[in-house]
Amino acid sequence: MFTDKETHRKPFPTWAHLLHSEPSKQFVFGNWKMNKTLTEAQTFLKSFISSDILSNPQIITGIIPPFTLLSACQQAVSDSPIFLGAQTTHEADSGAFTGEISAPMLKDIGVDFVLIGHSERRHIFHEQNPVLAEKAAAAIHSGMIPVLCIGETLEEQESGATQDILLNQLTIGLSKLPEQASFILAYEPVWAIGTGKVAHPDLVQETHAFCRKTIASLFSKDIAERTPILYGGSVKADDARSLSLCPDVNGLLVGGASLSSENFLSIIQQVDIP
């Protein structure tokens, strides 16, 4: 376990330089979605934080609890190498938006990064690319790192439209960010989310390479090379190593398998470090 908070618990903006100088780092984020009570979260973190598996400085680990658990989780991980993420944010800083949470509110309680446009937000709550662009910008302006989630449906994939869909999501979703912004990308094919289907590593590599090329065209080659691109979609320990071996895969966005500390640690342990 890390004990030096100042060295190992720096906020994401500081990582921009670190990522630029050490591109081999891998990110593993666990999205709890709408799961866990306070008691369940405390039980999870008690066993999770104490694991020696988290002592590898080349693997950046994050948990993404529901809003109700963010404060408690922040207190629990504050002296650990674990970073804290939120599942979404509103694009406005404040206002009459009953039930919403803003980026300044999240930053104020110690959130480091925030998911933008997770497939469930896009397809269940009908969040559109222009709004997601505003949310990503709000995260940046509040001092957090946006994790822009992109992906195609099964119908879009089978029709050969994957790259067109991703290009549109990237072009609009990143359009409000400053030229030198630090952000993370997560490719999560909709047809693999919660279905048990995992994309073949060859397909994942091809898609991630396309995304990196697109980032280079939208920003610069330098930003493209240092931007982490994660894969998400029914990730389990059996698949973690083969996926992380892909040259353009810089980590994993884990869903259901992150609800068990044992399963999540197994995935982290399997991630390959170049």
UniProtKB/Swiss-Prot annotation:
- Any single Pfam family the record assigns to this protein: TIM
- Sites binding substrate sit at N31, W32, K33, G194, S234, G255, G256
Give the positions the UniProt entry annotates as the active site. H118, E188
Which reactions appear under catalytic activity for this entry?
D-glyceraldehyde 3-phosphate = dihydroxyacetone phosphate
Predominant subcellular localization, coarse grouping: cytoplasm
- Where found, per UniProt? Cytoplasm
Instruction: Keywords in alphabetical order, please.
Output: Cytoplasm, Gluconeogenesis, Glycolysis, Isomerase
Q: Which InterPro entries match?
A: Aldolase_TIM, TIM_sf, TrioseP_Isoase_bac/euk, Triosephosphate_isomerase, Triosephosphate_isomerase_AS
What biological process terms from GO does the record include? gluconeogenesis; glyceraldehyde-3-phosphate biosynthetic process; glycerol catabolic process; glycolytic process
Q: In which pathway does it act?
A: Carbohydrate biosynthesis; gluconeogenesis; Carbohydrate degradation; glycolysis; D-glyceraldehyde 3-phosphate from glycerone phosphate: step 1/1
What GO CC terms are in its UniProt record?
A: cytosol
Q: How does it assemble?
A: Homodimer.
Stated name of the protein: Triosephosphate isomerase
Source species, please?
Chlamydia trachomatis serovar A (strain ATCC VR-571B / DSM 19440 / HAR-13)
Q: Which gene encodes it?
A: tpiA
